[in-house]
Amino acid sequence: MLANMKSFLQAIINVSEKAANIARACRREVQLFRLLVQEKSNEEKNQRFVQDFKTLADVLIQETVKHELGSKFPELIGFIQGEESNVFTNTLGETIEVKIMASQEDTAELLSKVLDGDRSAADLLALEVHRDVIIDSDIPQELNDTNNLLPMDTIGIWIDPIDSTAEYIQGTECSPDSHDIYVCGLRCVTVLIGAYNRKSGEPMIGVVNQPFFLENGDSWRGTFYWGVSCEGTVRNSFSAPPSPTSTVVLSGSETDALKENLAKHFELVEAAGAGYKLLSVARGLADIYILSRGSTFRHL
């Protein structure tokens, strides 16, 4: 089956925003936030939860993306993957597979089992999962042309539901540096959804959603970016190509020797989140993202 490139991209953007809504809800709603902040060391966290709530937030976003895209594009079922296992064991020893049910009520019922009967938290999560989300996007009309059709039986999806989880949990606030790059905090958190050719591994479409882009009183507003490079079409949501900045963005865990060598030629900015660092390069805030360790990988 062939799918319209514009409608496929719009579907990914919509579900990225639903994922962002879930991420924001987990920090905004008191009942959910109490669970979220329990992610500490094994000794400190509430032993009532066998798997921490942070992991459930990750998994719920991942399964929501899988459900939404699989429902709209059945050819993708079985080829939408993420980094989290969706199997949980509650304190009663029950093994539960987290998945999105047909109704909000059924999803809440399943989630309450994972959360050891905390129905209030389960209801709040299920509400966001089943909420209709359609976000305005400035996708060029040319992606709606009949020559921009995608063979869905060749496409795979990879999801990183909450990138920079530590910053998401801690929820600290940082000021941007002179290049407008945030080195830590909620602004480094991203939801990453990518479509790729599952035969060659070549990336085709990517969406990066920043759930915590702009603080607005007691709430947050997000933003998103997209890019397309497939079937001879190359487009993205950036208004202009980036200009050189002589800046390298990297993780603070890189070796001192590497940093010393780079500092001879570039200004270094240590920032959280692999997705956020890549986004900083795409936005032209930095020239290069350097990663010398095996903590981040390309999925094939």
PLM feature spans:
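N-terminal subdomain of lithium-sensitive/metallo-dependent phosphomonoesterases centered on the IMPase/IPPase/PAP
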Residues: 1-162, 178-182, 200
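An extended, acidic
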Residues: 3-6, 12, 19, 212-215, ...
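Short loop/turn segments at secondary-structure transitions that flank enzyme active sites
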Residues: 29, 86-88, 165, 197, ...
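Short amphipathic alpha-helical segments and helix-helix/interface helices
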Residues: 66, 70, 145-147, 192-193, ...
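Conserved residues at the C-terminal ends of beta-strands
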Residues: 83, 209, 292
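DPxDG-like acidic metal-binding loop motif
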Residues: 148-228
